[in-house]
């Protein structure tokens, strides 16, 4: 279980008012905010914090979201892709979006190029 704390008293003055996530199962501490010595998001053994007094800080995990829509936008003409299929040497830098990734059109197989052409351009909505 992970617990959020703010250190209110410590022999190490660099820890005063710092905020940490303490993972008791792994015996680790992740720094969220510290005035000195520790960097944000730094993970250290919990024993490195030494003796301290603290107050609990509420932790809220974001709700998981499922579903949604994905849209790839390629701004070009159908004729450009058709010409790139016929004359790839004229379009060495032509980059398109496929499933959220940028890819060089010429690196796709002929079947993939035709699939992109079919999916990208429609007659109507």
Curated annotation (Swiss-Prot):
UniProt-listed PANTHER family: FORMATE ACETYLTRANSFERASE, FORMATE ACETYLTRANSFERASE 1
Alphabetized Gene3D superfamilies for the sequence: 3.20.70.20
Alphabetical UniProt keywords: Organic radical
Residue ranges occupied by any Glycine radical domain in the UniProt entry: 5-125
Role, per record: Acts as a radical domain for damaged PFL and possibly other radical proteins.
Glycine radical: residues carrying this PTM: 100
Name this protein carries in UniProt: Autonomous glycyl radical cofactor
Native source organism of the sequence: Psychromonas ingrahamii (strain DSM 17664 / CCUG 51855 / 37)
Gene Ontology terms for molecular function: formate C-acetyltransferase activity
A GO cellular-component term linked to this record: cytosol
């Amino acid at each position: 279980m992970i617990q959020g704390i703010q250190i209110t008293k410590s022999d190490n003055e660099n820890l005063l008012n710092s905020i940490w996530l303490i993972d008791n199962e792994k015996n680790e501490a992740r720094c969220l905010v510290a005035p000195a010595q520790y960097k944000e998001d730094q993970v250290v053994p919990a024993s490195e914090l030494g003796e301290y007094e603290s107050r609990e800080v509420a932790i809220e995990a974001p709700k998981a979201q499922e579903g949604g829509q994905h849209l790839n936008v390629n701004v070009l003409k159908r004729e450009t892709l058709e010409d790139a299929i016929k004359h790839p040497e004229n379009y060495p830098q032509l980059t398109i979006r496929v499933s959220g990734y940028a890819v060089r059109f010429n690196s796709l197989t002929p079947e993939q190029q035709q699939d992109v052409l079919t999916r990208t351009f429609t007659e109507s909505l």
